[in-house]
């Protein structure tokens, strides 16, 4: 029986070993990390809500009214008043008939996909989908068809050739490592043409895209009984958890069949209570989204890499591809020495040879903070 020493050494040799740092302050651009002040460009707190005083006050109020833990699965006694209210609010906000809460986005996908497709069915997945969608598709035991990134012709051909009794197309809305946006109108049109369902992972679009931040479906004005939207509540919403929204019967089926919903303790009621306030702030958050857009435009206008490649993203995710694992991690370490925290992303998260710095911007970042990052990157290239 191995003690994994050789395996860990192999990770070290390839510059693939992951390490954690300890954050000693609330989520914000300016952090205390391992005892050091740090300017962070690595959080998914896109609207700066995670440390918002209104959310903190709402969480405190929720804890006083409902306690800390929910105590059970939602199907036992864990479904509390804030959960029910939040599901109604999310359905209304995103424009779907019904919404269902999950404890995390990973669990939402891992439960929803196998509930919708199984043996005898077929799943069609974009090659660059998030790990949770990939794992969910494998877990489902459905026939898995992986199509090249955003290749509509390949997807159309695969759908046309499939004889499966039920077909499910799954795709990120905003791809988490490249920052680009999926062609959702075309994906939905293909799904409807071939009698398939479309599940969209809107983890990085909810709160940011569409009128009042209502998400990717609203951004493209999509509506269909065959469309399901998964959104996370720990990114732009500043809290924790996730939801799946869709037609009444589809969501009811997921409630009945999603094992990660049935066998997981419900998220803490104080968080659900705070998220009701978060949805209000998202709805009223045009100024926050405008500031985020300004910071994105600033970065792209001023960071003009010569040797590295800034991928063509217009979202808060701005990937700077360096290439090699060792060089990428060296640049990340040198930025950290300068008080700038930008994570290096390596295989298997991204394809070999495309290791990168994953720069994420927030509405809470200032013009001066982005300028500081750009200056440091220019010095290091």
Identify the role of each PLM range.
Residues 2-68, 196:
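N-terminal "arm"/small-domain region of PLP-dependent enzymes with the aminotransferase-like
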Residues 45, 145-200, 362:
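Active-site phosphate-binding strand-loop segment of PLP-dependent enzymes
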Residues 53, 57, 61, 65, ...:
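PLP-dependent enzyme catalytic core of the Aspartate aminotransferase-like
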Residues 57, 61-104:
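Conserved N-terminal alpha-helix of the aminotransferase class I/II PLP-enzyme fold
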Residues 112-131:
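Conserved PLP-anchoring active-site segment centered on the Schiff-base-forming lysine
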Residues 212, 218-253:
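Active-site PLP attachment segment
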Residues 236-303, 308-311:
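PLP-dependent aminotransferase class I/II
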Residues 290-297, 304-338, 354, 361-363:
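Conserved PLP-binding catalytic core of the aspartate aminotransferase-like
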